[in-house]
C-alpha cells in the first residue's frame, strides 16, 4: 500500500469521513489499513477504524501481528473500535461454527459502520449532523460501541443497561470524554423512557470518569 499512497489520496479527496475496516493479523489488514488511515488523516478527513482481532484458534503468531497492526493503526485514526472475534460467542444467538465464524465477524464490522453512518444519514426526531459526530470522534483514540435491545416493561432502561455492559468489546464506557446516544424504537415510545435510557448512560460514564480521575 505504501507505493499506492498517491492513488489512495486521489480516491479519498473530497471525503468528509472515512471508515477503515479490517480483520487484523493477516497481511492486507495489518499492513494496508494503517497506510490508508495515514493518507486519510493527513488529508484532514475524519478517520474511523473498526477492526477485528483473530479468534484464539488462529494462533499466537497471528494475534501478535494483529496487536502490532492495531498499534500502528491507532497512530493514524481519530477513533478506533477493536472487536475481539473471540467475544462473538458471547453475543451470538446461534452456535458459532468454523463455517460461519468469519462471516459473523464481517457482519459485526458492517454493523459498526452502518450504526455510525446512520447517526448522520438517517432522519430522526433529534438529528445529528456531521459536525456533532466529528466533535466526539475527532482525535478520540480508542472508542467503545455498545448495542442493546429489549422488549416489554422497562425496555428502554434494559436496552441502555445492555448497551453499557456490552460484552463485545475490550474497552468500556469508563473514562469516556463524550457519548453519542442513538435510540431506535416504535413510534409510541414515551418521553420518560427516552429520558431514562439517556440518563442511565450519561450517569454511568460520568460516574465512572469521576472514579478514574
PLM regions: where:
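Tubulin/FtsZ superfamily GTPase core signature
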Residues: 1-212
Amino acid at each position: 500500500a505504501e507505493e499506492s499512497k498517491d492513488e489512495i489520496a486521489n480516491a479519498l479527496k473530497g471525503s468528509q469521513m472515512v471508515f477503515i475496516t479490517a480483520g487484523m493479523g493477516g497481511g492486507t489488514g495489518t499492513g494496508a489499513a494503517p497506510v490508508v488511515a495515514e493518507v486519510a488523516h493527513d488529508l484532514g478527513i475524519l478517520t474511523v477504524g473498526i477492526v477485528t482481532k483473530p479468534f484464539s484458534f488462529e494462533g499466537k503468531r497471528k494475534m501478535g501481528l494483529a496487536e502490532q497492526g492495531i498499534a500502528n493503526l491507532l497512530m493514524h485514526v481519530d477513533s478506533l473500535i477493536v472487536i475481539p472475534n473471540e467475544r462473538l460467542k458471547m453475543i451470538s444467538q446461534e452456535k458459532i461454527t468454523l463455517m460461519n465464524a468469519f462471516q459473523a465477524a464481517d457482519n459485526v464490522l458492517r454493523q459498526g459502520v452502518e450504526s455510525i453512518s446512520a447517526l448522520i444519514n438517517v432522519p430522526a426526531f433529534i438529528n445529528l449532523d456531521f459536525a456533532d459526530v466529528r466533535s466526539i470522534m475527532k482525535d478520540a483514540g480508542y472508542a467503545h460501541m455498545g448495542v442493546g435491545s429489549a422488549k416489554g416493561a422497562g425496555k428502554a432502561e434494559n436496552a441502555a443497561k445492555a448497551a453499557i455492559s456490552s460484552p463485545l468489546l475490550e474497552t468500556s464506557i469508563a473514562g469516556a470524554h463524550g457519548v453519542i446516544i442513538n435510540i431506535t424504537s416504535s413510534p409510541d415510545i414515551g418521553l420518560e423512557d427516552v429520558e431514562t435510557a439517556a440518563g442511565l448512560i450519561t450517569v454511568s460514564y460520568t460516574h465512572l470518569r469521576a472514579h478514574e480521575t
